């Protein structure tokens, strides 16, 4: 443990020195937090964003890549006023696994698919050209991109389990060991250092100087998966944050948390983590159907119930964190299509009502600084109910039915809701 702590400290000192030497960077181009508000170019920054987990894959020149399509999707989002994208840096572990996205970035510990890394480079260049921002998450507590389970398998914990194959309870029993496993965590810390310290192969500049990055995010929905693991979970989150800040002091650091639902229902745990100085702003996610706030048979007849439960969830977290002057971003929310359809262009009356409510909640008060809907699929069209190589990547990863929460470019009423809210957010930021 002393060796690990010493290694981390030396890395922090080394990369902090590099940061001091960086020149020619306008800090106003970077998102910051001032007095409890997100700021950009000296003005409050409120936004309507989206999730586009697959963007680095699409930006690559390998399997799954299509740079012309990427640019078209970015142009469409930019035209809607959606300039904030939450993106997976890359998947970990083996390929060809059930529920697992492909291609992967890190097939073995410390071994990288350079095609995906170069895709990430290209993506950041394209975002910079459009004045767009990215939240880049580095890990995942869920199986669809490897994450916890990949690191545990590499650390000798046994074969990674998959909920759809092995059962959800069995999966939880497996991944709850991540926050306790020193070897697995060190493998992840090595990955963090490798990615955050990277220089862009196109521009030659370190990632730390890219204004396209709003935030480095520790993971997608990080969890302890047990009450007993909460203390080690907190230390894992804050250790990762310290490593990131030691390499890149310019960009924000966030957790990717769902809120108390991701902290074993402990609001105290969520508050304690987000109040720490290593974390710049707070995250929550909201999933009314998944969390059973609303019954299946009232999903489309009682949207108001989902809205009220969502407001109460936001309020609880705002009340808990406001004394620490940390803004909250609702970075995932979603709602089913009418009649539980997955088809592009099918009716979205209930979804549109819910999106309108959430964006209004963000725009008409101080509880939320921004929101990212889940998820953008744009011109992609699912070829199968479950993703198969090499179908279009959609906003629904491989563990979900394709089209489940996707927003397609033919969902005109939903796009209208998004564009109107984004325009209001733009005016609020002037």
Language model features by range: what are they?
Residues 26-294, 301-327, 333-428:
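Active-site mouth of glycoside hydrolases
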Residues 7-16:
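Bacterial N-terminal signal peptides
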Residues 1-6:
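Positively charged n-region of N-terminal signal peptides that target proteins for export
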Residues 20-24:
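Boundary at the C-terminal end of the N-terminal hydrophobic targeting segment
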């Amino acid at each position: 443990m002393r060796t690990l702590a010493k290694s981390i400290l030396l890395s922090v000192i080394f990369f902090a020195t590099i940061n001091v030497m960086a020149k020619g960077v306008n800090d106003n181009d970077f998102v910051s937090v001032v007095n409890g508000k997100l700021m950009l170019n000296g003005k409050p920054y409120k936004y309507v964003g989206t999730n586009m987990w697959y963007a680095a894959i699409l930006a690559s020149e390998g399997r799954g890549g299509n740079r012309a399509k990427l640019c078209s999707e970015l142009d469409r989002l930019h035209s809607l006023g959606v300039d904030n994208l939450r993106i997976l840096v890359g998947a970990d572990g083996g390929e060809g696994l059930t529920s697992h996205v492909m291609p992967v970035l890190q097939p073995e510990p410390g071994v990288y698919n350079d095609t995906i890394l170069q895709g990430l480079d290209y993506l950041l260049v394209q975002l910079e050209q459009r004045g767009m921002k990215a939240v880049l998450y580095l890990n995942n507590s869920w199986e669809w991109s490897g994450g916890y389970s990949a690191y545990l398998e590499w650390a000798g914990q046994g074969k990674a389990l998959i909920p759809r194959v092995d059962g959800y309870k069995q999966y939880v029993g497996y991944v709850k060991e991540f926050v306790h496993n020193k070897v697995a965590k060190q493998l992840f810390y090595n990955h963090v250092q490798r990615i955050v310290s990277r220089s862009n192969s196109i521009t030659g500049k370190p990632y730390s100087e890219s204004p396209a990055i709003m935030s480095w995010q520790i993971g997608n929905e990080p969890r302890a998966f047990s009450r007993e693991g909460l203390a080690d979970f907190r230390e894992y989150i804050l250790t990762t944050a310290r490593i990131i800040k030691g390499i890149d002091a310019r960009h924000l650091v966030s957790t990717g948390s769902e809120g108390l639902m991701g902290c074993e229902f402990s609001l105290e745990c969520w508050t304690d983590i987000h109040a720490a100085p290593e974390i710049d702003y707070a995250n929550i996610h909201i999933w009314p159907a998944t969390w059973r706030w609303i019954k299946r048979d009232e999903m489309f007849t009682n949207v108001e119930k989902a809205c009220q439960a969502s407001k109460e969830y936001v309020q609880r977290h705002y009340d808990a964190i406001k004394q620490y002057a940390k803004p909250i971003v609702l970075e995932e929310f979603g709602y089913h299509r009418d009649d539980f359809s997955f088809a592009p262009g099918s009716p979205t009356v209930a979804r549109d009502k819910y999106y309108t409510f959430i964006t209004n909640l963000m725009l008409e008060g101080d509880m939320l600084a921004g929101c990212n809907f889940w998820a953008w699929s744009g011109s992609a069209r699912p070829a199968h109910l479950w993703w198969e190589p090499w179908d279009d990547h959609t906003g629904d990863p491989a563990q979900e039915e394709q089209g489940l929460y996707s927003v397609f470019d033919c969902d005109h009423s939903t796009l209208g809701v998004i564009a109107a809210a984004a325009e209001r957010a733009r005016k609020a930021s002037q």
